[in-house]
Amino acid sequence: MVLDTKRSLKIKIDALKRLEKDYMLYKKEEQLQIENVERFKADETKDIYDVKKQIEILDENKTMIIDSVSRVTAFLVQFSEFLEEHKNEDDGSEIWKDSYDIIDQISTKFLGE
């Protein structure tokens, strides 16, 4: 049972890291898209449709950021509940320390989002 729990912890840690990575990529893409919109607006040779399309892409990206924050938040709750349910199996191993560390790190990062 303990090995299954440790395996589950490893999977959950990796999943949480992936969700964080997705969020960071969307934030990076947002910055690039903001620059694109500004560049398209400043370029008089660009058609208004092109500018509108870039704004639409930016809006979609912002939606994905909101979605990724909600996915991270939901997973943090689920992961915290999992840790609480299995706390009697905590043997002080590295995987348990990593679990608590990643939850603290990502919770702190996403509190203000």
Swiss-Prot record:
A GO molecular function held by the record: beta-tubulin binding
Segments forming a coiled coil: none
Entry GO CC: cytoplasm; microtubule; microtubule cytoskeleton
Pfam families: TBCA (PF02970)
Keyword presence, Chloroplast: no
GO biological process: post-chaperonin tubulin folding pathway; protein folding; tubulin complex assembly
InterPro entries to which the protein is assigned, alphabetical: TBCA (IPR004226), TBCA_sf (IPR036126)
Keyword Repeat: no
Alphabetic keyword roster: Chaperone, Cytoplasm, Cytoskeleton, Microtubule
Main location: cytoplasm
Location of this chain's protein in the cell: Cytoplasm, Cytoskeleton
Family annotation (Gene3D superfamilies): 1.20.58.90
Subunit text: Supercomplex made of cofactors A to E. Cofactors A and D function by capturing and stabilizing tubulin in a quasi-native conformation. Cofactor E binds to the cofactor D-tubulin complex; interaction with cofactor C then causes the release of tubulin polypeptides that are committed to the native state.
Protein role: Tubulin-folding protein; involved in the early step of the tubulin folding pathway.
Family: Belongs to the TBCA family.
Protein name: Tubulin-specific chaperone A
Highest classification ranks of the organism: Eukaryota, Amoebozoa, Evosea, Eumycetozoa, Dictyostelia
